[in-house]
């Protein structure tokens, strides 16, 4: 039997006589979290945060043909068109902007499922020999392995 306990990953604004056990019992009864009790109910800033980005036209990305060929081989994507190269260059510029954002004084985020209790199913013991049943789910198999298409290239029928 698994023991499920509620863990709190954020501070709750309460009086000093607050007891965690009382709050856990209250949460179990209510089944809903009262966001007004949290010191920081959201991690989304209430006001815009100024950020200094350089002009994208200043950072012109030049990619040599050897790098383009390597990317085509690794990603199985054709980069011969001008539109594909423009998309690749803008993606690199965007990643460069993100890499230069100052995150020195930014605290890590809480978990997405901060106060939600996840329902767990009961464990069921099986014989464990269900290989044939699992392989029947796949469209294409080879010996005892799944066969998947390599990237965006379809398998021959």
From Swiss-Prot:
InterPro entries the record matches: Asp/Glu-ADT_sf_sub_c (IPR036113), GatC (IPR003837)
Entry's Gene Ontology cellular component terms: glutamyl-tRNA(Gln) amidotransferase complex; mitochondrion
Keyword Protein biosynthesis: yes
Domain of life: Eukaryota
SUPFAM superfamilies: Glu-tRNAGln amidotransferase C subunit (SSF141000)
Class of the enzyme per the UniProt entry, highest EC level: ligase
Keyword list, A-Z: ATP-binding, Ligase, Mitochondrion, Nucleotide-binding, Protein biosynthesis
Keyword DNA damage: no
Main localization category: mitochondrion
GO BP: any one term: mitochondrial translation
Catalysed reaction, written as an equation: L-glutamyl-tRNA(Gln) + L-glutamine + ATP + H2O = L-glutaminyl-tRNA(Gln) + L-glutamate + ADP + phosphate + H(+)
EC number: 6.3.5.-
Pfam families in UniProt: GatC
Compartments, as annotated in UniProt: Mitochondrion
MF terms in GO: ATP binding; glutaminyl-tRNA synthase (glutamine-hydrolyzing) activity
Note: This protein may be expected to contain an N-terminal transit peptide but none has been predicted.
Assigned protein family: Belongs to the GatC family.
General function of this protein: Allows the formation of correctly charged Gln-tRNA(Gln) through the transamidation of misacylated Glu-tRNA(Gln) in the mitochondria. The reaction takes place in the presence of glutamine and ATP through an activated gamma-phospho-Glu-tRNA(Gln).
Subunit structure comment from the entry: Subunit of the heterotrimeric GatCAB amidotransferase (AdT) complex, composed of A, B and C subunits.
Protein name: Glutamyl-tRNA(Gln) amidotransferase subunit C, mitochondrial
Species per Swiss-Prot/TrEMBL record: Drosophila virilis
């Amino acid at each position: 039997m698994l023991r499920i306990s509620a863990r709190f990953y954020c501070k709750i604004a309460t009086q000093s006589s607050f007891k965690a056990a009382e709050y856990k019992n209250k949460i179990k009864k209510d089944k809903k979290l009262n966001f007004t009790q949290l010191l920081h109910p959201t991690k989304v800033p209430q006001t815009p945060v100024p950020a200094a980005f350089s002009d994208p036209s200043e950072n012109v990305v030049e990619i040599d043909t050897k790098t383009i060929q390597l990317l085509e081989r690794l990603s199985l994507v054709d980069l011969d068109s001008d539109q594909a190269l423009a998309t690749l260059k803008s993606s690199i510029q965007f990643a460069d902007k993100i890499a230069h954002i100052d995150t020195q004084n930014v605290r890590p985020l809480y978990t997405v499922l901060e106060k939600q209790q996840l329902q767990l199913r009961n464990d069921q013991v099986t014989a464990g020999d269900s290989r044939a049943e699992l392989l029947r789910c796949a469209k294409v198999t080879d010996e005892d392995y799944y066969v998947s298409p390599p990237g965006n290239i379809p398998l021959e029928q």
